[in-house]
């Protein structure tokens, strides 16, 4: 049977031995049953695009799994188009270093981040000006930034439109309102409230991930990504510079420039000229410093 005769679906539920497949042809979710080489060789995850056939009114036989463009580990979802990094200017207070770490990590996993500032209904005029400054910094760095209030609904329609056709997950610090945003998008709540990079656990932890449809062809995971993460968990010291996307616009004197103390560093010159945000550059230096401190600690243990 050729692929043209098979039907295309998306794995939207993966827990233990249970697989749920959303069939694009009819918008119905079926119980997925792998067979043939898929059964023997392929580890199926939420977010996988699959091909197969409906064998009864409730069952979809999976014949093939498409090659993935990415696979996250928190949560374990394939083919993620956008990670919605939720932040707030206050309650909790914004920490650009934590955001910059998270941006490095998702750049490493080849997932496009979008920064969403929630709780804008709480801001006074001075705070709104500061939010506009943060907006400008991250837009200039090359990121999309949206501003919403999950409480009032302001900006939610724009977020839904922006995410049209994408597979998404939510990430961001504790208390920023990830569950409230998910509820606005889908009418449902997050099953796992937070995930820590240390414990790898959250309240009401589940072993699987469910992708919930919303908007026009969009899906969002009901289990969040990292609430806090250090880039050092994944990225090698020399690679950090490659994940600050605004740095890539500049040509330094030396190809292996670390943008720290080398002469002829175009990145440092750009910081000096105001072309690169001082806050972003300080985050970069702090991440490098974390590496150095970790190496020193390892040497002490040895």
Swiss-Prot record:
GO biological process, one term: ribosomal small subunit biogenesis
InterPro entries referenced in this protein's UniProt entry, alphabetically: G_CP_dom, NA-bd_OB-fold, P-loop_NTPase, Ribosome_biogen_GTPase_RsgA, RsgA_GTPase_dom
UniProt-listed Gene3D superfamilies: Nucleic acid-binding proteins, P-loop containing nucleotide triphosphate hydrolases, Probable gtpase engc, domain 3
Residue intervals of the CP-type G domain: 69-229
Compartmental location: Cytoplasm
Protein family per UniProt: Belongs to the TRAFAC class YlqF/YawG GTPase family. RsgA subfamily.
Function according to Swiss-Prot or TrEMBL: One of several proteins that assist in the late maturation steps of the functional core of the 30S ribosomal subunit. Helps release RbfA from mature subunits. May play a role in the assembly of ribosomal proteins into the subunit. Circularly permuted GTPase that catalyzes slow GTP hydrolysis, GTPase activity is stimulated by the 30S ribosomal subunit.
Name of this protein: Small ribosomal subunit biogenesis GTPase RsgA
Naturally occurring in which organism (per UniProt): Aquifex aeolicus (strain VF5)
């Amino acid at each position: 049977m050729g692929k043209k005769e098979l039907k295309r679906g998306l794995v939207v539920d993966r827990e233990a031995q249970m697989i749920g497949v959303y069939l694009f042809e009819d918008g119905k979710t079926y119980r997925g049953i792998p067979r043939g080489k898929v059964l023997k060789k392929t580890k199926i995850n939420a977010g996988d695009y699959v091909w197969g056939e409906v064998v009864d009114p409730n069952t979809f036989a999976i014949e093939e799994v498409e090659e993935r463009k990415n696979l996250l580990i928190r949560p374990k979802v394939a083919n993620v188009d956008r990670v919605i990094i939720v932040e707030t200017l206050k309650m909790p207070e914004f920490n650009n270093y934590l955001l910059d770490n998270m941006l490095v990590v998702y750049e490493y996993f080849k997932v496009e981040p979008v920064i969403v500032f929630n709780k804008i209904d709480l801001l006074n005029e001075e705070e709104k000006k500061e939010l506009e400054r943060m907006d400008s910094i991250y837009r200039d760095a090359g990121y999309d930034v949206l501003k919403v209030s999950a409480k009032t609904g302001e900006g939610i329609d724009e977020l839904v439109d922006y995410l049209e056709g994408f597979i998404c997950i939510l990430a961001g610090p504790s208390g920023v309102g990830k569950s409230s945003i998910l509820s606005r998008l889908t009418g449902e709540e997050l099953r796992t409230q937070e995930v820590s990079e240390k414990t790898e656990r959250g309240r009401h932890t589940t072993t699987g991930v469910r992708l919930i449809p919303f908007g026009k062809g969009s899906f969002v995971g009901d289990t969040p990504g990292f609430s806090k993460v250090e880039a050092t968990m994944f990225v090698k010291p020399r690679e950090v510079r490659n994940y600050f996307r605004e740095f890539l616009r500049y040509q330094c004197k030396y190809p292996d420039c670390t943008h720290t103390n080398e002469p002829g560093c175009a990145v440092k010159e750009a910081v000096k000229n105001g072309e690169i945000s001082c806050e972003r550059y300080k985050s970069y230096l702090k991440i490098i410093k974390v590496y150095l401190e970790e190496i020193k600690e390892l040497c002490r243990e040895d």
